[in-house]
Amino acid sequence: MAKGEFIRTKPHVNVGTIGHVDHGKTTLTAALTYVAAAENPNVEVKDYGEIDKAPEERARGITINTAHVEYETAKRHYSHVDCPGHADYIKNMITGAAQMDGAILVVSAADGPMPQTREHILLARQVGVPYIVVFMNKVDMVDDPELLDLVEMEVRDLLNQYEFPGDEVPVIRGSALLALEQMHRNPKTRRGENEWVDKIWELLDAIDEYIPTPVRDVDKPFLMPVEDVFTITGRGTVATGRIERGKVKVGDEVEIVGLAPETRKTVVTGVEMHRKTLQEGIAGDNVGVLLRGVSREEVERGQVLAKPGSITPHTKFEASVYVLKKEEGGRHTGFFSGYRPQFYFRTTDVTGVVQLPPGVEMVMPGDNVTFTVELIKPVALEEGLRFAIREGGRTVGAGVVTKILE
């Protein structure tokens, strides 16, 4: 049941915690809600236990455990995701189930960067998480300040290795647990009253300042994946679908992109929603778009309508992929180069051939891998586009386009 209406007064930003197991991601997530709630009555506190038993979600046919919390600062409203397990992070980031405008990388000062620290930074780079802020946690467990400097240098180096600006990324040192314990003792602790709580404020300030407010979907170039096509006698051909981004109105020029050998231009002669005429369709709307001079045969499900020049059709790309385990309903066996499944982009399946990278003989269920795909038909592709890999209608993997080759 919804608790009151969501009033949009502040810009909205999606963030999440990433980092190695047991470095304190969930404790930090809980601390953020408590600290923000002390200064803002709209924020609901969430304790460690509530966040840790993250509910299951499904995204692109894959089950993922993700916890969502919300909090706000004086400047912005945040949605924050936290995942209990490492595999959940991989699945979450690859499916884009929880898109992040920026990530909070949690690193334990006692351990320094660990294998999953590296893996999550790499994933963030591949799936296009644009900004990272670092919270160096558990600093109360380290007596030597030089050791803290060393850990900070290591983290900055690691970020640089994966093309994040490691030298300018904010690194905040604190203890999520000590901050949370203080908030449990006194839930009204304000900024300036406790050194550990102040570290959480320092992190919130860094998120406010360093992670820019994203461009809203409605301000991006128009794109609508075509779901269905039909003819209105005497008026022409209508393509229906949900507008992914941008807006569209009568008189706009659009391109029909993908599946066909040629991209063709046409003009929008009508926009309708639930059989009513619409002045303008915007991102998120389910609409029918009437297209001038286009026959029923010239547009089909799986193509996209887009602002001219904003997206192009391609057949060959590189992708970062998560292959489902047998227990997740995936394949029971591995696959090799030459594997030919269906790639489900937006609204349609297209067959493609997989080429594994040099040195990788075989990919097993449960693996996270980067490989090249060549599709048998062109599809409107761009970096960051998510897809499912299917065999006979069941999902066996999920991926994201990391590089377009041709």
Curated annotation (Swiss-Prot):
Keywords: Cytoplasm, Elongation factor, GTP-binding, Hydrolase, Magnesium, Metal-binding, Nucleotide-binding, Protein biosynthesis
Domain called tr-type G: residue spans: 10-215
Annotated spans, G4: 137-140
Region (G5): 175-177
Highest taxon of the lineage: Bacteria
UniProt-listed Enzyme Commission number(s): 3.6.5.3
Region (G2): 61-65
Gene Ontology terms for molecular function: GTP binding; GTPase activity; translation elongation factor activity
Primary location class: cytoplasm
Assembly and binders: Monomer.
Role of this protein: GTP hydrolase that promotes the GTP-dependent binding of aminoacyl-tRNA to the A-site of ribosomes during protein biosynthesis.
Catalytic activity: GTP + H2O = GDP + phosphate + H(+)
Keyword Magnesium: yes
Positions bound to GTP: 19-26, 82-86, 137-140
Subcellular localization, as worded in the UniProt entry: Cytoplasm
Protein name: Elongation factor Tu
Region (G3): 82-85
Similarity comment: family membership: Belongs to the TRAFAC class translation factor GTPase superfamily. Classic translation factor GTPase family. EF-Tu/EF-1A subfamily.
Pfam families: GTP_EFTU (PF00009), GTP_EFTU_D2 (PF03144), GTP_EFTU_D3 (PF03143)
